[in-house]
Curated annotation (Swiss-Prot):
GO molecular function term, any single one: structural constituent of cell wall
Recorded phenotype for the gene knockout or disruption: Leads to retarded growth and displays denser aerial mycelia. Slows down primordia formation, leading to fewer primordia and subsequently fewer fruiting bodies.
Matches recorded under SMART domains: HYDRO (SM00075)
Subcellular location: Secreted; Secreted, Cell wall
Annotated disulfide bonds: C33-C92, C40-C86, C41-C73, C93-C106
Source taxonomy: Eukaryota, Fungi, Dikarya, Basidiomycota, Agaricomycotina
Family named by the database record: Belongs to the fungal hydrophobin family.
Gene coding for it: fbh1
Domain of life of the source: Eukaryota
Location (main, coarse): secreted
Species: Pleurotus ostreatus (strain PC15) (Oyster mushroom)
A GO CC annotation given for this chain: extracellular region
Signal peptide start and end residues: 1-20
Assembly and interaction partners: Self-assembles to form functional amyloid fibrils called rodlets. Self-assembly into fibrillar rodlets occurs spontaneously at hydrophobic:hydrophilic interfaces and the rodlets further associate laterally to form amphipathic monolayers.
This protein's name: Fruiting body-specific class I hydrophobin fbh1
Length: 113
């Protein structure tokens, strides 16, 4: 009987210690842009959309892409600085082509600017 009580106390103590252990947050905050660059773009659409094909075709960019294509973009270099804003779609793009005219491999992000 005594051994059952000891086992119960040890089990309860172990559960409390596990619950009290610090947990490290490994999630990347939404406003960070991994290996790409943060851009403010006038237009963001699926690479398979007809509008994207119309933009990519004349620029000799492959039209069998997947993901999002952003166009008419400008970099947001100083995120969080007073006066920095984007009235269009903020995206994180891995490939900035044609001086921001077309950006490939984009993901929408929310910077709360």
């Amino acid at each position: 009987m005594f051994s059952i009580r000891i086992a119960t106390v040890v089990l309860a103590a172990s559960a409390l210690l596990a619950a009290a252990s610090p947990i490290t947050n490994t999630e990347t905050p939404v406003n960070q842009c991994g290996s790409g660059s943060i851009q403010c773009c006038e237009s963001v659409q699926s690479a398979s959309a007809a509008q994207a094909a119309g933009i990519l075709g004349p620029l000799d960019i492959l039209t069998n892409l997947q993901g999002l294509v952003a166009s008419h973009c400008s970099p947001l270099a100083a995120v969080g600085v007073s006066g920095t804003s984007c009235s269009s779609q903020t995206v994180c793009c891995k490939d900035v082509s044609k001086s921001g005219l077309v950006n490939l491999g984009c993901s929408p992000i929310n910077l709360n600017l």
